[in-house]
Design a protein with these regions (language model features):
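Short helix-capping and inter-helix turn/linker motifs at the boundaries of alpha-helical repeat units
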Residues: 1, 70, 211-215
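A short beta-sheet element
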Residues: 140-143, 147-200, 204-219
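Non-catalytic DNA-recognition/assembly elements of restriction-modification systems
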Residues: 6-9, 13, 18, 75-106, ...
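Conserved structured core elements
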Residues: 4, 82, 87-90, 139-142, ...
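Active-site-proximal structural scaffolding
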Residues: 3-4, 8, 12, 86-90, ...
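Sequence-specific dsDNA recognition surfaces
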Residues: 73-79, 94-104, 115-147, 165, ...
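Extended, domain-scale alpha-helical bundle/helix-rich regions
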Residues: 6-75
């Protein structure tokens, strides 16, 4: 087993809750999900984000299987990627994040493109970010980011251009090649979940195109994520 394979194996075991013993007294992930929902409601009431009218609730039936409950009240069995501890939850990824949309830059900014990501360390190369005026802004320079936003490149996702916005000393704008995820989840947990081979494989399966395969926001948002009690 190569070092990269070992790293991937350890990461996957962590995402399945198999690295450390699970404490039944830990707060269940359902409580974290409630706090996320409350925060989204707050942002909706403040007019900062829009309500998702097609929100899907996922629950575990008495038979141990997972089901999706849709806005119209109907339910459907859902295939989950793997088993997780009882205190964890499977949710659609759109349920755990929000973003503040897009805007055409009105003042000078630092531009985060996919080439701005150091893929070996999965960090943003802040020193190499272009400083651009509004007139110099590329057409893709539109995504608003916040402190601890997680960036996931939807173009050629197998390259794993994924990072967390750790510094917000200047006005930053990200490329529309990224999905920007703002959340109450631990941003490091989310980053590593998005980096896991299992998740990337699911993204690749939903991507279209040959030279530059990409996944659209709709299909990305329907992907499942395992919500840990301490995530």
């Amino acid at each position: 087993m190569t070092p990269e394979q070992l790293k991937a194996s350890i990461l996957q075991r962590a995402m399945e809750g198999k690295l450390v013993p699970q404490n039944p007294n830990d707060e269940p992930a359902s409580e974290l999900l409630k706090r996320i929902k409350a925060e989204k409601e707050k942002l909706i009431s403040e007019g900062k984000i829009k309500r998702d009218k097609k929100e899907t609730e996922i629950f575990r039936g008495d038979d141990g299987k997972h089901y999706g409950k849709f806005a119209d009240g109907s339910t459907q069995e859902i295939d989950v990627p793997y088993d997780i501890p009882d205190t964890w939850e499977w949710v659609r990824i759109k349920s755990i994040y929000w973003n503040f949309g897009q805007n055409k830059p009105e003042k000078s900014f630092r531009y985060i493109d996919t080439s701005s990501i150091d893929r070996k360390k999965n960090i943003i190369n802040y020193k190499n970010l272009q400083y651009l005026s509004p007139e110099q802004a590329p057409s893709r320079a539109r995504k608003l980011v916040s402190q601890n936003s997680v960036l996931f490149s939807t173009v050629r996702p197998y390259l794993k251009n994924i990072a967390v916005v750790r510094e917000l000393k200047e006005y930053l704008i990200a490329s529309t090649a990224f999905i920007v995820l703002d959340t109450l989840l631990n941003e490091t947990y989310l980053k590593y979940y998005l980096l896991s081979d299992n998740f990337i494989n699911r993204v690749n399966n939903k991507s279209t195109g040959t030279s530059y395969p990409a996944i659209n926001d709709y299909n990305f948002n329907l992907l499942l994520i395992a919500l840990a009690h301490d995530s």
